C-alpha cells in the first residue's frame, strides 16, 4: 500500500492542515502502516489497530504538545508515535537502540508522561492540569484510559480528586474496547453526543437550574428526572457523581463523531466547563479481520505475515516456566482442595487458562487491581484456604504495602508465583522484574525462592505451598535449560542449596560461585573456564548460611550471581551472612546494575549486563587478577 497522505505527516501540525474529508483516508493508511510495521518487528497489535481514528481525532483537535496527552498503559500508542515524527523509526520498535513500545518522555516532546503500568494516566493528567494553572498557563490535559485500566482503584482515586476542581481543563477519554457496552450508532447518537458536549446544552442546563432555584422541590425533581433520562441514554452516570460532564458512548471509529465532539469538549474545558469525560467504544483489531476475530492472539505477536496471519508455532522442545507453573497449579489443585488461584487480569500470560477450565470455582480474576489481589488472597488464607497469586514480578510492586501489612505482618500462607523475574526483553525497563529479591527479602516472615530449572521450579512451588507463612517463587520469562520434570509433587528442604559443580584439585586460586535462579546455568559456563565451584542456592531467604560458610572456608574468592538488582539483592544477603559470622573473604557481587536496562533481545541484554558466561568469567578474572586462559595457536601450514 502507498502512504500518500501519511508520508506528509511529520508532526500533528501537518495533520491539522488536512481537510476533514481527508482524515478517513489517513486513518486507512495509518492502520495499514501499523499492521505492516508490527508484522515486521513484533509488538502490540490489536490495541493499536483499535485506536487509529481516536489518535487522529485527538491530535487534530487538541494543540499537542502544548495540550498534554497522556496514554494510559501506552501499548496502544503506536499510531501516536507514527503521527509525531517517529514513522521511519517504527522499524526499530522495541529493539536495542530503537524506539520504545510505550510513551517515553526522553523520546519525544509529544510523550508527555512515561507509561507502561496501568491506570496512572488520570493522576498524571490531573497533575499537569493543576501544574499549568499554578504557572498561569492555559492548556488542556487529556488522559486516554482503557476500560480494563478502569478496574484499578488508582483511576478512581484520581477521578475522585479531580472532581473537586469544578473549572479545571481536564479531559478523560475512556477507550472502551471490551464491547461490554454496545455503542449506539447512526445520526441520532452522533447528534446526542454533540448536544451533550456543546455549549447550548451547558447553557440551557445552567439556565434551567437558575430559573428553578427559586423552587427547590421543583429543581430537585427536575434534576432527578434529568439523571433518569440521561441514564437511559448513556451506560453510567457514575462519572457525573465524580464531578465530570459525561458524554457518550460514541463510536470511536467514526471521525465524523469524534472530531466535532472533541472540539466541543476542548472548547468547554478551556472556557471553565470543568472536567470532561468522553466515553468512546472501539474494537480491538479494527480493520484486520484476523485480529478482530482473535484480539488476544494478536495482542502482542512476534513477526508474522499479515496475508497469512499467525501460524501455529511448532511445539517447543522445552516448556516455558509459565507452562511449568500452569501444570503444577492444576496438579496441586487436584491434590489439595484448599488451593485457590488468583490473577490480576493476566490469565493467559500467567499460565492459568487450563486451571480456569478445570477449577472454575477456585479461579479468581480480580482485574487490574494488584493491591486488592494481595489483600483478597490474605482474606482467603484467613479462612483456611491456600491462595496462589500468579503475578508478574513488576506488577507485585503495586501491592507492596498490602504485601507487608495485610499478608506478612499476619504471617498468612499466601504463595506468590512471580513470573517474568529478571529481564524481559522487548518490553524494557517498565516490565523488568529487577527488584523483587531486594524488596521481598527485607520483609519479616517472607520466604523467597529462586529455581534454576524447570523441575526445581515445580519442586520449589510445592515447597512454598506447604509452608505456613508467605512465600514467593520467582522465575524468568521463557524456557529453562531443559531439565526433566518429575510428575510427583515433591518439595525440597527449606533453606538448603545444592552444589552443582565442584572445583578441581589443580593448583591455582579457587573460586566459589553462589548462583541464584536463572544465573546457575551461565555460572556453570563460567566455572568450566575457571574450574570453579557452583552452588545453586535455591533460597534467598532463608539463606543457606551453612553452605555460604563452607564455600568461604574452601575457596579463595566468592562470587554471587543473580538476575536481579545487585543493590539489596541476594549478593547483599550473602555479604550480610559473612559479616554476621565474622568471615572476611573477598566477594564479587554480580547482578543487574544500578540503572534501568533498556529494551532489546534478552540474551543481548544479559550480555550487556555482563551476566552471560563470558561476561561472568571476565568480571571474575578482572576483579581478582586471575590469569587469562592460555590460547594455543596452531602453526600456519605452508
UniProtKB/Swiss-Prot annotation:
Q: Which SMART domains match?
A: Transket_pyr (SM00861)
Q: Which residues bind thiamine diphosphate?
A: 75, 116-118, 148-149, 177, 288, 370
What keywords were assigned to this record?
Isoprene biosynthesis, Magnesium, Metal-binding, Thiamine biosynthesis, Thiamine pyrophosphate, Transferase
Highest taxon of source: Bacteria
Give the enzyme's main class according to its UniProt record, as a single word: transferase
Quote the record's binding site residues for Mg(2+). 147, 177
The cofactor required is: Mg(2+); thiamine diphosphate
Which pathway is it part of? Metabolic intermediate biosynthesis; 1-deoxy-D-xylulose 5-phosphate biosynthesis; 1-deoxy-D-xylulose 5-phosphate from D-glyceraldehyde 3-phosphate and pyruvate: step 1/1
Give the matching InterPro entries.
Dxylulose-5-P_synthase (IPR005477), THDP-binding (IPR029061), Transketo_C/PFOR_II (IPR009014), Transketolase-like_Pyr-bd (IPR005475), Transketolase_BS (IPR020826), Transketolase_C (IPR033248), Transketolase_CS (IPR049557)
* Record-level GO BP terms: 1-deoxy-D-xylulose 5-phosphate biosynthetic process; isopentenyl diphosphate biosynthetic process, methylerythritol 4-phosphate pathway; terpenoid biosynthetic process; thiamine biosynthetic process
Q: Which reaction does it catalyse?
A: D-glyceraldehyde 3-phosphate + pyruvate + H(+) = 1-deoxy-D-xylulose 5-phosphate + CO2
Annotated GO CC locations: cytosol
Extract the signal peptide range. Answer: none
Q: Which SUPFAM superfamilies match?
A: Thiamin diphosphate-binding fold (THDP-binding), TK C-terminal domain-like
The cofactor note reads: Binds 1 Mg(2+) ion per subunit. Binds 1 thiamine pyrophosphate per subunit.
User: EC no.?
Assistant: 2.2.1.7
Q: Which GO terms describe its molecular function?
A: 1-deoxy-D-xylulose-5-phosphate synthase activity; magnesium ion binding; thiamine pyrophosphate binding
- UniProt cross-references to Pfam families, sorted A to Z: DXP_synthase_N, Transket_pyr, Transketolase_C
Q: What does this protein do?
A: Catalyzes the acyloin condensation reaction between C atoms 2 and 3 of pyruvate and glyceraldehyde 3-phosphate to yield 1-deoxy-D-xylulose-5-phosphate (DXP).
The record's note on quaternary structure and interaction partners says: Homodimer.
Family designation: Belongs to the transketolase family. DXPS subfamily.
> What is this protein's record name?
1-deoxy-D-xylulose-5-phosphate synthase
Q: What is the lineage of its organism?
A: Bacteria, Pseudomonadati, Pseudomonadota, Betaproteobacteria, Burkholderiales
Question: What is this protein's gene name?
Answer: dxs
Amino acid at each position: 500500500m502507498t502512504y500518500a497522505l501519511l508520508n506528509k505527516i511529520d508532526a500533528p501540525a501537518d495533520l491539522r492542515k488536512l481537510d476533514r474529508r481527508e482524515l478517513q483516508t489517513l486513518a486507512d493508511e495509518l492502520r495499514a502502516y501499523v499492521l505492516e510495521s508490527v508484522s515486521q518487528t513484533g509488538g502490540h497489535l490489536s490495541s493499536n489497530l483499535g485506536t487509529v481514528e481516536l489518535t487522529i481525532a485527538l491530535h487534530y483537535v487538541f494543540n499537542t504538545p502544548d495540550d498534554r496527552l497522556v496514554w494510559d498503559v501506552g501499548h496502544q500508542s503506536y499510531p501516536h508515535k507514527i503521527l509525531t515524527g517517529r514513522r521511519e523509526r517504527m522499524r526499530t520498535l522495541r529493539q536495542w537502540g530503537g524506539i520504545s513500545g510505550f510513551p517515553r518522555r526522553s523520546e519525544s516532546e509529544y510523550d508527555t508522561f512515561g507509561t507502561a503500568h496501568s491506570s496512572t494516566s488520570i493522576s498524571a493528567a490531573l497533575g499537569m492540569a493543576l501544574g499549568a494553572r499554578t504557572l498561569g498557563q492555559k492548556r488542556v490535559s487529556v488522559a486516554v484510559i482503557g476500560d480494563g485500566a478502569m478496574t484499578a482503584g488508582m483511576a478512581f482515586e484520581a477521578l475522585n480528586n479531580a472532581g473537586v476542581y469544578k473549572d479545571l481543563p481536564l479531559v478523560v477519554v475512556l477507550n472502551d474496547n471490551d464491547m461490554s457496552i454496545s455503542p449506539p450508532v447512526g445520526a441520532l447518537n452522533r447528534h446526542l453526543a454533540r448536544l451533550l458536549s456543546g455549549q447550548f446544552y451547558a447553557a440551557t442546563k445552567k439556565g434551567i437550574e437558575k430559573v428553578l432555584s427559586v423552587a427547590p422541590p421543583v429543581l430537585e425533581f427536575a434534576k432527578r428526572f434529568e439523571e433518569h433520562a440521561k441514564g437511559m441514554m448513556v451506560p453510567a452516570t457514575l462519572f457525573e457523581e465524580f464531578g465530570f460532564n459525561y458524554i457518550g458512548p460514541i463510536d470511536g471509529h467514526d471521525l465524523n463523531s469524534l472530531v466535532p465532539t472533541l472540539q466541543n469538549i476542548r472548547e468547554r474545558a478551556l472556557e471553565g466547563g470543568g472536567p470532561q469525560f468522553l466515553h468512546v467504544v472501539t474494537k480491538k483489531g479494527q480493520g484486520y479481520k484476523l485480529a478482530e476475530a482473535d484480539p488476544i492472539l494478536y495482542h502482542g505477536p512476534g513477526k508474522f505475515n499479515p496475508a497469512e496471519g499467525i501460524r501455529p508455532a511448532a511445539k517447543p522442545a522445552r516448556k516455558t516456566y509459565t507452562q511449568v507453573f500452569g501444570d503444577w497449579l492444576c496438579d496441586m489443585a487436584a491434590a489439595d482442595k484448599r488451593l485457590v488461584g488468583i490473577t490480576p487480569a493476566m490469565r493467559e500470560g500467567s499460565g492459568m487458562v487450563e486451571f480456569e477450565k478445570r477449577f472454575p470455582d477456585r479461579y479468581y480474576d480480580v482485574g487490574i487491581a494488584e493491591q486488592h489481589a494481595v489483600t483478597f488472597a490474605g482474606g482467603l488464607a484467613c479462612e483456611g484456604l491456600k491462595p496462589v497469586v500468579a503475578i508478574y514480578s513488576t506488577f507485585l510492586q503495586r501491592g507492596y504495602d498490602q504485601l507487608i501489612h495485610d499478608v506478612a505482618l499476619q504471617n498468612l500462607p499466601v504463595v506468590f508465583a512471580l513470573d517474568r523475574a529478571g529481564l524481559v526483553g522487548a518490553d524494557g525497563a517498565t516490565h523488568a522484574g529487577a527488584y523483587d529479591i531486594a524488596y521481598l527479602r527485607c520483609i519479616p516472615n517472607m520466604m523467597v525462592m529462586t529455581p534454576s530449572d524447570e523441575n526445581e521450579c515445580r519442586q520449589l512451588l510445592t515447597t512454598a505451598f506447604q509452608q505456613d507463612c508467605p512465600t514467593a517463587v520467582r522465575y524468568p520469562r521463557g524456557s529453562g535449560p531443559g531439565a526433566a520434570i518429575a510428575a510427583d509433587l515433591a518439595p525440597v528442604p527449606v533453606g538448603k542449596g545444592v552444589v552443582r559443580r565442584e572445583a578441581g584439585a589443580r593448583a591455582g586460586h579457587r573460586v566459589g560461585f553462589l548462583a541464584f535462579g536463572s544465573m546457575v546455568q551461565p555460572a556453570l559456563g563460567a566455572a568450566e573456564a575457571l574450574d570453579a565451584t557452583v552452588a545453586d542456592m535455591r533460597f534467598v531467604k532463608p539463606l543457606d548460611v551453612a553452605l555460604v560458610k563452607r564455600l568461604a572456608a574452601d575457596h579463595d574468592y566468592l562470587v554471587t550471581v543473580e538476575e536481579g538488582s545487585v543493590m539489596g539483592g541476594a549478593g547483599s544477603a550473602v555479604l550480610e551472612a559473612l559479616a554476621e559470622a565474622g568471615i572476611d573473604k573477598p566477594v564479587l557481587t554480580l547482578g543487574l546494575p544500578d540503572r534501568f536496562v533498556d529494551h532489546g533481545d534478552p540474551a543481548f541484554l544479559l550480555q550487556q549486563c555482563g551476566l552471560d558466561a563470558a561476561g561472568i568469567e571476565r568480571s571474575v578474572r578482572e576483579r581478582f587478577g586471575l590469569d587469562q586462559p592460555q590460547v594455543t595457536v596452531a602453526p600456519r601450514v605452508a
